UniProtKB/Swiss-Prot annotation:
GO terms for cellular component: cytoplasm. GO terms for molecular function: ATP binding; metal ion binding; nucleoside diphosphate kinase activity. It comes from Picrophilus torridus (strain ATCC 700027 / DSM 9790 / JCM 10055 / NBRC 100828 / KAW 2/3). It holds the Pfam family NDK. Its main location: cytoplasm. CDD domains: NDPk_I. HAMAP family: NDP_kinase. This is Nucleoside diphosphate kinase.
Length: 138
């Protein structure tokens, strides 16, 4: 079984889309193994977006992720990463297919509702930013 980190970003929380996002992952057959609402620190956001550190939009990403509460969750299932990425849709919501979370709800490329780990390596780095091992259920 594979796991994937999902974040409902500040715009998703602010727009009351938490339940909708969670239910889409559950309907896809993915089990929730960890779930919490939290405020992201600047240090956590910088670590999460570290692959973008040298890009001009890095500071905007960090500011956005720390602008309000998020919901962090870990889902598990067969091909959890690929399934989660398909559910999320293209990063740019204007290019995301209808029926995907971003296609249905995204406001722009930054305020795009959700994050989903894009690889097993990303998941292994990312989940440790948001969860301690004792917060993850077997």
């Amino acid at each position: 079984m594979e796991r994937c980190l999902i974040l409902v970003k500040p715009d998703g929380v602010e727009r009351n889309l938490i339940g909708e996002v969670i239910s889409r992952f559950e309907r896809k057959g993915l089990a929730i193994k960890a779930l919490k609402m939290m405020r992201v620190t600047r240090e956590q956001a910088e670590d999460h977006y570290s692959v973008h550190r040298l890009k001009p939009f890095f500071d905007d990403l960090v500011s956005y992720l720390t602008s309000g509460p998020i919901v962090a969750m870990i889902v598990e299932g067969n091909n959890a990463i690929a399934s989660s990425r398909m559910l999320a849709g293209a990063t740019d919501g204007s290019k995301a297919a209808p029926g995907t979370i971003r296609g249905d709800f995204s406001l722009d490329i930054e305020r795009n509702i959700v994050h989903a780990s894009d690889s097993l390596e990303s998941y292994e780095h990312e989940y440790k930013i948001f969860f301690n091992e004792n917060e993850i259920m077997d």
